[in-house]
Structures are given as structure tokens and as C-alpha cells.
UniProtKB/Swiss-Prot annotation:
Coiled coil: none
Lineage of the organism: Bacteria, Pseudomonadati, Pseudomonadota, Gammaproteobacteria, Legionellales
CDD domains: HATPase_Hsp90-like
GO molecular function: ATP binding; ATP hydrolysis activity; ATP-dependent protein folding chaperone; unfolded protein binding
Assembly behavior: Homodimer.
Protein name: Chaperone protein HtpG
Entry GO CC: cytoplasm
Assigned protein family: Belongs to the heat shock protein 90 family.
Subcellular location: Cytoplasm
Spans annotated as C: 551-623
Primary location group: cytoplasm
């Protein structure tokens, strides 16, 4: 008997979600069962965890399970669990509303590919709504563990924009979802069809999934049997687990639709005993760069689920890794706070980090094509590694990939080991340039002398690169050197002597240029970097790089005041022309023009672009 029944409207976003799910995934209908079983499994996990501190929640029934029953006469499928259950408020919140951000992201990720889109519903936590792909009405009966039988609820909807909810006495805790199938979906009334779907998607679920036994004639009996393996897969030895089972477990814990690139499964014995199963995904999740997004591994203690997104077992730069840690020695009532200062957790974290880096190194060595796919998805995150993890800096550095002047492509595919192996005889530094974009780096005038001498330069255009080179100042005994900071020594004594002679000859010109630019520059020098350009701006050796200054300014950060050094090419026709200009106004016009041109070529911005345009026009008129 239902009491205090109310009719409520779905949140606008849920209406939109229902429409998308039903109409986008109709050709892959079977995924409804995968999602509902996954939700039931989560409910059992939550109950077992909460019962660690409150055993009364079991209500004298600690035999946790999922059951599926088919009623051909009524054309229904019922998925039941004796997990944590739902209260009235939870039913309204979980079944009637959804986070707007989740809806927006779900919609933006839809591709029109049935196989891919069918997996997104789990990734975005909206798997329950897949029930409406096959059902024209869904009835949910539930009672949260610990509440009175009279607090049981019944929720019902036809997926048409509203739902009803009321109280109904329920003696047992947990949730029972009944799907009233649409006539065209009667294939799911077949016992063998349902068993096949369970075998395909849910065999790895560690809770038993029960269905009624079948006689040899295929008729149901009153007895139930377990139709999945119901084993914590990660506790088995590697030899006992098939590749397909590893992949299905990954998809279950990650809600990903693609197979992982690789994985590492380890049983550790000794002072501390634990199991780790770590996966490298094939693509980045939608929330990889959202600061508030939750990342981390699933934590179990002696096979008992403790928490999702345990971030303490991997550093943040490896937040893309999915997997499981099952520890034998941690207390069952461990909290996130206790995890922070636990010596065993620190030990597991160090081991997990080394295993992930080892996995990636193996992939980079043995399967360069797959590693390149990984880098294209996660390279930007991995570049955070040397900044965060000093202990593993060398191992991470070997995994980094870059664009270079030798590769001739924006694609980041050159390792530092490759760069070092190609270094010129006598070259003792790894040269790089940072810029706001690949094209800005590739076309920088600072590269001219390096191109002439055939010296390879790393082209760094990711924002994180400025921080990366600040923390990773050498590799394989070779110092990393910015070609846009300080002096460049390329071991050419003849050129150095020539510049010294020219400095004496051109001293009056240099002084005149300094007087024009005044406090806009730290100094004016002759350059040994340029072959084709008249001038360039560089940062002093001890100053912050010009690109870093721009990044910080764009972020609204305080930037130490530092002025660039203006370097001129004495062999360029425009610099030679300065000798012949007698008019001070014209000289000032030309010098200012050359300086601002150099700032723009280096990717900088001018304080007053309109003045620059006026100067260009004046020079064009006078030429």
C-alpha cells in the first residue's frame, strides 16, 4: 500500500538526458543491464563499507548479492540487490536530478557512434536512465539500511518528464528495479539472452549475480544459481586471468568505452602485503584538467571496498591512471585523513609510481606507435612530473617527447635520448626555445645560427614547458640551455673574436641606440645568434624568461620587473643603414621600429600597437 504519494517533474537536465539516452543508444540496448548491475554492485560495496563501523546495517543478512528475475507473463525484468538502499530524499536526488555540468559534458561528448556513446552513460554517472532504452515504465522499490520498514519508498516513471514517489512498507533493505519492457524488446525475456549479457559485461563483478536455475528443458526452477564468476579478479594470479577479463574489469572500474593501452598486475609479499592492478587508459577523460575533478585508485582492504578515488597512492601527474589497490595490513576503518600520514601508504605509493613509469618505459621502448598514442593523450600531464617528483625525475625525463627543429613537425615525438644521440661533436648542451605556439617557436629569429650550424633545438610551446625546464635543468649530464636567454657559446672562437672587433668599431652606434631605447632595455649588444634578421630581444641569464613573464602576466600574477637585452646583427643591411642616418628623429624612428619588430618576432606584445603602425606608415612614406 503506497502512502503519501507525490508526483514530481524531472529536472530539465534529466529530461534532456532521458531523450538523449533513449534516442542515441537504441541500437545497443543490452547495455542497460550492465549499468544496472554496476549500480547494484556499488550499492553492495557501500553497505559493506558502512557496516564496518555499524554492523547493525546488515540487519542479520550479511549475504550480499544481486538477483535478476524474468516474468514473461508481465513482460518485466527485476534487478534486485540487498545493498545500502535509498531513502526518500536520496531517491528524489539520485533518480530525479543530475548535476548540470555532468549533463553538459555528456552532451558535448556524444559522437553518434553507438558503441562509443553507450559507454559514456556510465562515465557520467547516468547509467540508471539506460533502463528507459528498453522499458516504457520503471518501478524502483527501495529502503535504506538502518531505516524502518515503513520508510521504504516506491518510485515510478514512464520517462515522460515526471515521476511519482511514495512510501511503501519494505521488510528487506536494498533496491529492487523492475523494468516493464516495451513490446519490441521481448528478446530480453530470454533467460539465455540475459545470461549472455552478464557473461559479456559483468562476469568480473565480485558479488554473486543470481538467476533461477534452468532444467535440461530450459524451464526455470525455484532454486537460484550464481551466473557470474563472482571473484575479486585482481586477487587471482595473472595466469588465471584472460586478457579479455582484464579489459572488462578495466571498463567496469573506469567507465571507459575503450580497451586500456596496457596494465600491470602485482602481488607484493613481505613486510607489507598488497595487490595492485594499474591500467593506462587509451584516451584522456573529459575532466582531466578540471581542478575539482576526482582522480585516484579504488582502495580495498582484504577485498573489502573502502573508497573510490584514493589519491594517496599516485602523484598528481599520474592522475590518468586507473586501477585497484588491495592492502592486507591497512585498518578497515581507515579514512582519507589517516591515509595522508601512513607509512605503508607511502611505500605503496612509491611502488605504484615506479610501476607506472616502468610500464610506460617498456611501452616507449617496445611499442613506439602505442606510446605515441599515449603521449598525444597524456604527454602534457606527464610534463608535470619533474616539477612534482624529484625522486623520479630521471625516469620521467626519459619518457618526455618534444618537437624539434630536426623533426620538422608539431608532433611531439623526439625523446631527450634521441636528441643527445644526434648532438654535434663538441656540443655539450641541450638547446631549447620556449614560445606561445609551435609556429612562434619554429619561426623565432633565435634559431638562425643554430639552423646554419645544423644544431638541433627543442621547440617548447606548452605552457607547462616553462616550469618544466626550470626544474629539469640537465639530462644525461648535458645542461639544458635556452637560446633566448643570456650568451650563446657555440665554440666558434673566430666568430667571438670578430664580434669583439666589431664592438670596438660600432661602440658609438651602440651608445646611440642605447640612448634612444633608454629604460626600455637592459643593454644593447652585438649578436652571434642571427644570420638573417636585423635584431632580436633576449632575456638576461639571471632574469625570468620572456615567455614565462607573459604567462604569469596573463594569469594576473606579479612579475618581477626585468628588461630585455636588445641584440643587433652588425652584418644586416638595416643595421648598416643606421650608420648613414644623420637626422636624430629618423634615427629614433628606425631604432624604435627595429626594437618593436624584434619584440613581435619573439612573440611579445607592444604597449601601443597604434604607435607601431604609425611608425611603419611613416617609414613607408619616406622610403
Amino acid at each position: 500500500m503506497v502512502s503519501k504519494q507525490q508526483t514530481m517533474g524531472f529536472q530539465t537536465e534529466v529530461k534532456q538526458m532521458l531523450h538523449l539516452v533513449v534516442h542515441s543508444l537504441y541500437s545497443n540496448k543490452e547495455i542497460f543491464l550492465r549499468e544496472l548491475i554496476s549500480n547494484a554492485s556499488d550499492a553492495l560495496d557501500k553497505l559493506r563499507f558502512l557496516a564496518l563501523s555499524n554492523g547493525s546495517l546488515f540487519e542479520n543478512d550479511s549475504d550480499l548479492k544481486i538477483s535478476i528475475q524474468i516474468n514473461e507473463k508481465l513482460q518485466t525484468i527485476t534487478i534486485s540487490d540487498n545493498g545500502i538502499g535509498l531513502s526518500w530524499e536520496e531517491a528524489v536526488e539520485n533518480l530525479g536530478t543530475i548535476a548540470k555540468s555532468g549533463t553538459k559534458e555528456f552532451i558535448s561528448q556524444l559522437t553518434g557512434e553507438q558503441a562509443k556513446d553507450s559507454q559514456l552513460i556510465g562515465q557520467f554517472g547516468v547509467g540508471f536512465y539506460s533502463a528507459f532504452i528498453v522499458a516504457d515504465k520503471v518501478t524502483v522499490k527501495s529502503r535504506r539500511a538502518g531505516l524502518q520498514p515503513e520508510d521504504g519508498i516506491v518510485w515510478e516513471s514512464k520517462g515522460d518528464g515526471e515521476f511519482t514517489i511514495g512510501y511503501e512498507k519494505k521488510l528487506t533493505r536494498g533496491t529492487e528495479i523492475t523494468l516493464h519492457l516495451k513490446p519490441e524488446n521481448d528478446e530480453f525475456l530470454s533467460d539465455w539472452r540475459i545470461r549472455g549479457i552478464i557473461s559479456k559485461y559483468s562476469d568480473h563483478i565480485c558479488w554473486p549475480i543470481l538467476m533461477k536455475k534452468l532444467s535440461e528443458e530450459g524451464k526455470e526452477s525455484k532454486e537460484f544459481e550464481t551466473v557470474n564468476k563472482a571473484t575479486a579478479l585482481w586477487t587471482l594470479q595473472k595466469s588465471e586471468i584472460s586478457e579479455e577479463e582484464y579489459k572488462q574489469l578495466y571498463k567496469h572500474i573506469s567507465h571507459d568505452y575503450m580497451d586500456p593501452l596496457t596494465w600491470s598486475h602485482n602481488h607484493v609479499e613481505g613486510k607489507h602485503e598488497y595487490i595492485t592492478l594499474l591500467y593506462i587508459p587509451a584516451h584522456a577523460p573529459f575532466d582531466l584538467w578540471q581542478h575539482e575533478a576526482k582522480h585516484g585508485l579504488k582502495l580495498y582492504v582484504k577485498r573489502v571496498f573502502i573508497m573510490d578515488e584514493a589519491t594517496q597512492f599516485l602523484p598528481r601527474y599520474l592522475r590518468f591512471v586507473k586501477g585497484i589497490v588491495d592492502a592486507s595490513d591497512l585498518p578497515l576503518n581507515i579514512s582519507r585523513e589517516i591515509l595522508q600520514d601512513n607509512k605503508q601508504v607511502e611505500s605503496i605509493r612509491a611502488a605504484c609510481t615506479k610501476r607506472v613509469l616502468s610500464m610506460l618505459e617498456k611501452m616507449a621502448t617496445n611499442d613506439k606507435e602505442t606510446y605515441q598514442k599515449f603521449w598525444n593523450e597524456f604527454g602534457l600531464v606527464l610534463k608535470e612530473g619533474p616539477i612534482e617528483d624529484f625522486a623520479n625525475k630521471e625516469a620521467i625525463a626519459k619518457l618526455l617527447r618534444f618537437s624539434t627543429t630536426a623533426s620538422g613537425s608539431e608532433k611531439q615525438e623526439v625523446s631527450l635520448e634521441e636528441y643527445v644521440s644526434r648532438m654535434k661533436e663538441g656540443q655539450d648542451k641541450i638547446y631549447y626555445i620556449t614560445a606561445s605556439s609551435y609556429n612562434a617557436a619554429k619561426n623565432s629569429p633565435h634559431l638562425e645560427i643554430f639552423r646554419k650550424k645544423g644544431i638541433e633545438v627543442l621547440l617548447l610551446s606548452d605552457k607547462v614547458d616553462e616550469w618544466l625546464v626550470g626544474y629539469m635543468n640537465e639530462f644525461a649530464g648535458k645542461k639544458l640551455q635556452s637560446i633566448s636567454k643570456g650568451k650563446i657559446e657555440l665554440g666558434d672562437d673566430e666568430t667571438s673574436e670578430q664580434i669583439k672587433e666589431q664592438e670596438k668599431t660600432l661602440e658609438p652606434l651602440i651608445k646611440h641606440i642605447k640612448s634612444v631605447l633608454n629604460d626600455r632595455v637592459k643593454d644593447v649588444l652585438l649578436t652571434n645568434r642571427l644570420t638573417d634578421s636585423p635584431a632580436c630581444v633576449v632575456a638576461d641569464e639571471q632574469d625570468m624568461g620572456l615567455e614565462m613573464q607573459r604567462i604569469l602576466q596573463a594569469a594576473g600574477q606579479q612579475v618581477p620587473v626585468s628588461k630585455p637585452i636588445f641584440e643587433i646583427n652588425p652584418d644586416h643591411a638595416l643595421i648598416k643603414r643606421l650608420h648613414d642616418i644623420q637626422d636624430d628623429n629618423q634615427f629614433e624612428l628606425w631604432v624604435t621600429m627595429l626594437f618593436e619588430q624584434a619584440v613581435l618576432a619573439e612573440g611579445g606584445q607592444l604597449d601601443n600597437p597604434a604607435d607601431f603602425v604609425n611608425r611603419v606608415n611613416r617609414l613607408l612614406v619616406s622610403s
